[in-house]
């Protein structure tokens, strides 16, 4: 395979790593169609590109559930609405097929998401989840699932204000039906159902630029198994380097280094929850977890074998029993098609973390605080990379959100081509830093004030 073909393979991989079905490149003016050109979004309560936010808060006038229609939005006569029961194996399989075949545009890449029942139990069944918020569109005649969108309830923190919301995810329309304008109808229908439950705000992300991002972060990627990535043509060989050079450069030890590092247990929840809340309070856009939500997100199904495990959570316990650090990552592997040697590509995603390393300082940006935090995060996330590799993951991904820019360069996370834009629905907010400089390099000085992590 030529280097040009390998570069194309890598480009396709990076598209997949964006976890959305739209292509993206750098944030350019060309992508920013004027609001008047966004036919759908100009009718929605979202911030305009050039709007100067004076006061943060809801965009729409207050409403009640009684103001919202009880009837689903009309569809073309050949389609019908359905609610997906994620506990039903057949219905869940329909979602897998739809996402696998349509969630990413380029099907020549030779790889697909390997969605599992375990992943969706974790992602879609958080406390307070509603079957009615897992919405599908089927062809009446064949019952084929051709579109899907989901929402889960969350409480957002936006610069200290609590905002009851939903998190929108897994919006997917069959490629052959994208001219039917199903996406706006899906968004309106999920909005209607959520509004009927007296929730009026939402958080969502996309690789494309819509009106108008509250923040933008960049994807970064840390090879854990460079040789495998090269053998399946997901990465090329840089000029002036040998395979041995690249393997050595990305090598990791088999064992972690941090004393007291162990898996998170249920009996740790009270202590870790308090550590996590205090750490998250530094950021301007966060999810405010209940203790029940925290346990669901970070304990997972303990009885699962390693190859089916979704969430991996660890703590650092000191000799006196105090837990000073916590980190987590999740797994969403790819299936590799048409490869005789490898069937799967293990993909790990850095999730949430917390540490008390800089708690003694009043200002997180104090040089001494920054040094203490950077040192500790480099140690913790280095161990996270080792644990991810030991869990058969081949690439470890992180955004420039949270305090990630303090360790990305040191730990050999390379910048990806993908950018993730964060959006608030029916909530006007001033821009929030996403860990990027104007030239899209990592902003180590200001870091990011995005503390929420979207799947």
Swiss-Prot record:
For this protein, the Enzyme Commission number is: 2.3.1.97
List localization entries.
Cytoplasm
Q: Name one GO molecular function term.
A: glycylpeptide N-tetradecanoyltransferase activity
- What effect on the protein does mutating residue 404 to Y have, as reported in its record? Moderately reduces affinity for substrate, but not for myristoyl-CoA
State the activity regulation. Inhibited by diethylpyrocarbonate. Competitively inhibited by S-(2-oxo)pentadecyl-CoA, a non hydrolysable myristoyl-CoA analog, and by SC-58272, a peptidomimetic derived from the N-terminal sequence of a natural substrate.
Q: Which UniProt keywords apply?
A: Acyltransferase, Cytoplasm, Transferase
Q: What reaction(s) does this enzyme catalyze?
A: N-terminal glycyl-[protein] + tetradecanoyl-CoA = N-tetradecanoylglycyl-[protein] + CoA + H(+)
UniProt-annotated catalytic positions: 455
* Residues holding tetradecanoyl-CoA: 38-41
Variation of activity with pH: Optimum pH is 7.5-8.0.
Annotated Gene Ontology cellular components are: cytosol
Stretches the record annotates as Myristoyl CoA-binding: 168-204
Query: Among the record's GO biological process terms, what is one?
Result: protein localization to membrane
PTM per Swiss-Prot/TrEMBL: The N-terminus is blocked.
Question: Which Gene3D superfamilies would you find in this protein's record?
Answer: 3.40.630.30
- What does the subunit section of this Swiss-Prot or TrEMBL entry state? Monomer.
Q: What does this protein do?
A: Adds a myristoyl group to the N-terminal glycine residue of certain cellular proteins. Substrate specificity requires an N-terminal glycine in the nascent polypeptide substrates. Uncharged amino acids are preferred at position 2 while neutral residues are favored at positions 3 and 4. Ser is present at position 5 in almost all known N-myristoyl proteins and Lys is commonly encountered at postion 6.
The family note in this entry says: Belongs to the NMT family.
Q: What else is known?
A: Has an ordered Bi-Bi kinetic mechanism, with myristoyl-CoA binding taking place prior to peptide binding and CoA release occurring before acylated peptide release. Cooperative interactions between the acyl-CoA and peptide binding sites of NMT contribute to its extraordinary chain-length specificity.
Query: Under what name is this protein listed?
Result: Glycylpeptide N-tetradecanoyltransferase
């Amino acid at each position: 395979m030529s280097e040009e073909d390998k570069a194309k393979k890598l480009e396709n991989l990076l598209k997949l790593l964006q976890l959305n079905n739209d292509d993206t490149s750098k944030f350019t003016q060309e992508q920013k169609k004027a609001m008047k050109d966004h036919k759908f979004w100009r009718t929605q309560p979202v911030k305009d590109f050039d709007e100067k936010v004076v006061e943060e808060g809801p965009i729409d006038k207050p409403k009640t559930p009684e103001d919202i229609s009880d009837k689903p939005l009309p569809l073309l006569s050949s389609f019908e609405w359905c609610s997906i029961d994620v506990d039903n194996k057949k219905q869940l399989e329909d979602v897998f097929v739809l996402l696998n075949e349509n969630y990413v545009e380029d099907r020549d890449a030779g790889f697909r998401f390997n969605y599992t029942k375990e992943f969706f139990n974790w992602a879609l069944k958080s406390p307070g989840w509603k079957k009615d918020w897992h919405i599908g569109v089927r062809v009446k005649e064949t019952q084929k699932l051709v579109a899907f969108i989901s929402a889960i309830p969350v409480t957002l923190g936006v610069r200290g204000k609590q905002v009851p919301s939903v998190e929108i995810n897994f919006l997917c329309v069959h490629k052959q039906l994208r001219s039917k304008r199903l996406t706006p109808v899906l968004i309106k229908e999920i909005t209607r159902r959520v509004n009927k439950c007296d929730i009026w705000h939402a958080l969502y992300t996309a690789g494309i630029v819509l009106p108008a991002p509250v923040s933008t972060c960049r994807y970064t990627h840390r090879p854990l198994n460079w040789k495998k990535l090269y053998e399946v043509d997901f990465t090329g060989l840089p000029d002036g380097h040998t395979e041995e050079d690249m393997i050595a450069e990305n090598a990791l030890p088999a064992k972690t280094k941090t004393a007291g590092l162990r898996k998170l247990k249920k009996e740790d929840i009270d202590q870790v929850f308090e550590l996590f809340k205090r750490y998250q309070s530094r950021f301007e856009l966060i999810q405010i977890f209940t203790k029940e939500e925290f346990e669901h997100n970070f304990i997972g199904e303990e009885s699962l074998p390693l190859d089916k495990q979704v969430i991996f959570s660890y703590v650092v316990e000191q000799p006196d029993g105090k837990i000073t650090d916590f980190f987590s990552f999740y797994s969403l592997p790819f299936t590799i098609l048409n490869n005789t040697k490898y069937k799967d590509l293990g993909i790990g995603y850095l999730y949430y973390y917390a540490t008390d390393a800089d708690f003694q300082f009043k200002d997180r940006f104090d040089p001494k605080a920054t040094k203490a935090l950077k040192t500790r995060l480099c140690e913790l996330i280095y161990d996270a990379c080792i644990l991810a590799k030991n869990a058969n993951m081949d690439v470890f991904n992180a955004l420039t959100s949270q305090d990630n820019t303090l360790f990305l360069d040191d730990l050999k996370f390379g910048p990806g081509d993908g950018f993730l834009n964060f959006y608030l629905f029916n909530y006007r907010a001033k821009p929030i830093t996403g860990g990027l400089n104007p030239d899209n390099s990592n902003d180590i000085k200001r870091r990011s004030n995005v503390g929420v992590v979207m799947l």
